[in-house]
């Protein structure tokens, strides 16, 4: 018991040390008034494996109407088209004006939860919303604030902001409403402004995109479900095999038991009895014979005695014979 406690304590210490290696990125408030969403580009982040990011659904304010959003993890082509019609992956829904709550993303390569998010280094991942900030437009699957206000997050996992310039992911021309947000430099996890090192912009197709990451995410889940299904099938087959084997063994045991019962003698031998007279034969034996199954039973039996040679008896009993017949030989 003491050893188990020490092991649990060691595991807890290791977990805290591993958790301390990552850092908490600056939370992102999902609101149209957030100046971090740059017009035509969105918000670019450079998280590392082990980091955490909180997306905040703010509490409603009486001075302005509450904004309703449904956030999705999307592929690059979905982000460019501002469309979540095909294969939507919902992360969080901001639809409770009475309270503020957070959705935490932990950037980890392997998730202990089979429905958890998994990330790979040097790949891009995308978050956006196609809602239009109203309750009626919460379920919109096209356009929305992704198109009008560039409310999207580009997460470049394990990448250096000074080595790779952020791509200009312009989907469509933003509306005039979005122009009043102003253009502010995007800050990475090192709290430094993202600068263009002077390299020419390259095509998005030449770089790792979130499509592979999201596809890998779904493929890993499919593999887990397939493995679970295969294990269940194998387990069921083993159970069926054991049940069939048990039934066969029980049938065989019953068959042997019936054969042994049928092989029992139909008569009972009495003890040999010696006569008190001196002139009587020493091999006098009284044998009671009784039929058990049928009224007519031809029977051949060998009887051994302690006072002479073996005696063989052949009997044929008609149906009207009494139950017990005694022969003196």
Swiss-Prot record:
GO cellular component, one term: presynaptic membrane
Tissue spec. comment: Expressed at low levels in most tissues with highest levels in the kidney, oocytes, ovary and testis.
Entry protein name: Ephrin-B1
Transmembrane spans: 227-247
Glycosylation sites: 132, 203
Source organism of the structure: Xenopus laevis (African clawed frog)
Signal peptide bounds: 1-20
Similarity-based family: Belongs to the ephrin family.
Classification of source organism: Eukaryota, Metazoa, Chordata, Craniata, Vertebrata
Motif stretch (PDZ-binding): 327-329
SUPFAM superfamilies, alphabetized: Cupredoxins
Primary location: membrane
A molecular-function term among this protein's GO annotations: ephrin receptor binding
Location relative to the cell: Membrane
Function: Cell surface transmembrane ligand for Eph receptors, a family of receptor tyrosine kinases which are crucial for migration, repulsion and adhesion during neuronal, vascular and epithelial development. Binds promiscuously Eph receptors residing on adjacent cells, leading to contact-dependent bidirectional signaling into neighboring cells. The signaling pathway downstream of the receptor is referred to as forward signaling while the signaling pathway downstream of the ephrin ligand is referred to as reverse signaling. May have a role in the developing mesenchymal and nervous tissue.
Coiled-coil zones: none
Gene: efnb1
Changes after translation: Inducible phosphorylation of tyrosine residues in the cytoplasmic domain. Tyrosine phosphorylation inhibits TLE4-binding.
Keyword check for Transmembrane: yes
Residues in Ephrin RBD domain copies: 23-157
Cysteines joined through disulfide linkages: 57-94, 82-146
PANTHER family, alphabetized: EPHRIN, EPHRIN-B1
Annotated region (Disordered), positions in chain: 163-192
Keywords annotated in UniProt: Developmental protein, Differentiation, Disulfide bond, Glycoprotein, Membrane, Neurogenesis, Phosphoprotein, Signal, Transmembrane, Transmembrane helix
